[in-house]
């Protein structure tokens, strides 16, 4: 195990040096230690990290279906699409979805927390892939593009979504293990994860190796691991960004999350991470399996059936729209 760890960190340090060289030579002018950019209208590359598990595959297929529908709509700044497959080998979707295969972390290093592979996957992809666009959207398999997505970022300030449960200030004791006082107040750390985020490619090249390092350090610290749990990697991205002095524009309209967000409106992405449980009167029964339900975790081993029944009257429009979009995708995917 020590040899594996040594090899991994040697590889990580080499990538850091290469990425650091690219950042230093290609970013442009630096004023008072901060990078200054001018272009704000470029397209962004849509990148989603994934595994070869059936659960990940069916979500990616639905996401890619709606990407293709939204890409060329008026107001969209979407460029090309890549599924970054961190299972280390090809799968059966290679010819259906543009895919770039990267290596997972060495055996045992993720300690069962598979999301820890995400920052390492981005480091490898950024170094090895040819990416034409100047910006990148970091997305997830359970994202559906519900409105044309413009480039919400500027070249020196990425755009992110503020998560109500990412609370750096309330976890200052833990945050100081990774964001020391000399770096500034913990309020420098944005209440975000890495997804959804639209970011200039060179800024992500700067952040990504630090994101790997902070993620591994957090997972290795028992207190941090216990307190942050499944959102540990999200905190790691937020801290890594702050360590590089990078602030995100916080866009609540970036994403909605049924069943808590009731209307689609002018938001851009539906994130169906939460289960939607209702009784037949249209009342939410969250925490209790409903008489009607849609929960992605019901389909761990195989995709959802075609033509899922629509929710009963009274259920919010966001949930109805989600089910209709899933149904349209599954009806048109072979």
Curated annotation (Swiss-Prot):
Its main location: Golgi. It is an enzyme of class 2 (transferase). It is a single-pass type II membrane protein. The chain crosses the membrane at residues 1-18. Keywords: Glycosyltransferase, Golgi apparatus, Membrane, Signal-anchor, Transferase, Transmembrane, Transmembrane helix. It is found in: Golgi apparatus membrane. Its EC number is 2.4.2.58. GO terms for cellular component: Golgi membrane. Probable glycosyltransferase involved in the O-arabinosylation of several proteins including extensins and small signaling peptides. Catalyzes the transfer of the initial L-arabinose to the hydroxyl group of Hyp residues. Probably involved in the arabinosylation of CLAVATA3/ESR-related (CLE) signaling peptides that move from root to shoot, to interact with receptor kinase signaling that regulates nodulation. Involved in long distance nodulation signaling events. This is Hydroxyproline O-arabinosyltransferase NOD3. It catalyses: trans-4-hydroxy-L-prolyl-[protein] + UDP-beta-L-arabinofuranose = O-(beta-L-arabinofuranosyl)-trans-4-hydroxy-L-prolyl-[protein] + UDP + H(+). GO terms for molecular function: hydroxyproline O-arabinosyltransferase activity. Disruption phenotype: Dramatic increase in root nodule number when inoculated with Rhizobium strains. Inhibition of root growth in both the presence and absence of rhizobia. Pfam families: HPAT. Belongs to the RDN family.
């Amino acid at each position: 195990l020590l040899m594996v760890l040594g090899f991994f960190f040697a590889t990580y340090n080499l990538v850091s040096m290469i990425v650091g060289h690219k950042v230093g030579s290609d970013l442009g002018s630096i004023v008072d230690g901060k990078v200054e950019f001018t272009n704000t209208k470029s397209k962004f590359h849509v990148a989603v990290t994934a595994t070869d598990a059936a659960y990940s595959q069916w979500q990616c297929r639905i996401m890619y279906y709606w990407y293709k529908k939204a890409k060329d709509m008026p107001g969209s700044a979407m460029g090309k699409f890549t599924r970054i497959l961190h299972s280390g080998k090809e799968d059966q979707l290679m010819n259906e979805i543009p895919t770039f295969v990267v290596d997972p972390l060495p055996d045992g290093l993720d300690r069962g927390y598979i999301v820890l592979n995400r920052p390492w996957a981005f480091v490898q992809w950024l170094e090895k892939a040819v990416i034409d666009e100047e910006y990148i959207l970091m997305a997830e398999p359970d994202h559906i593009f519900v409105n044309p997505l413009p480039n919400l970022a500027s070249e020196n300030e990425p755009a992110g979504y503020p998560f109500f449960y990412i609370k750096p200030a309330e976890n200052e004791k833990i945050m100081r293990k990774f964001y020391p006082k000399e770096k500034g107040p913990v309020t420098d750390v944005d209440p975000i994860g890495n997804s959804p985020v639209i970011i200039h490619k060179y800024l992500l090249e700067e952040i990504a190796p630090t994101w790997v390092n902070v993620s591994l350090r957090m997972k290795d610290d028992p207190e941090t691991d216990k307190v942050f749990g499944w959102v540990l990697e999200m905190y790691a991205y937020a801290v890594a960004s702050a360590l590089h002095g990078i602030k995100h524009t916080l866009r609540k309209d970036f994403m909605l999350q049924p069943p808590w967000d009731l209307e689609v409106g002018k938001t851009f992405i539906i994130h169906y991470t939460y289960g939607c449980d209702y009784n037949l009167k249209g009342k939410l029964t969250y925490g209790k399996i409903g008489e009607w339900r849609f929960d992605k975790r019901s389909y761990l081993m195989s995709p959802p059936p075609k033509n899922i029944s629509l929710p009963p009257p009274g259920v919010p429009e966001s949930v109805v729209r989600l089910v209709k979009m899933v149904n349209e995708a599954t009806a048109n995917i072979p």
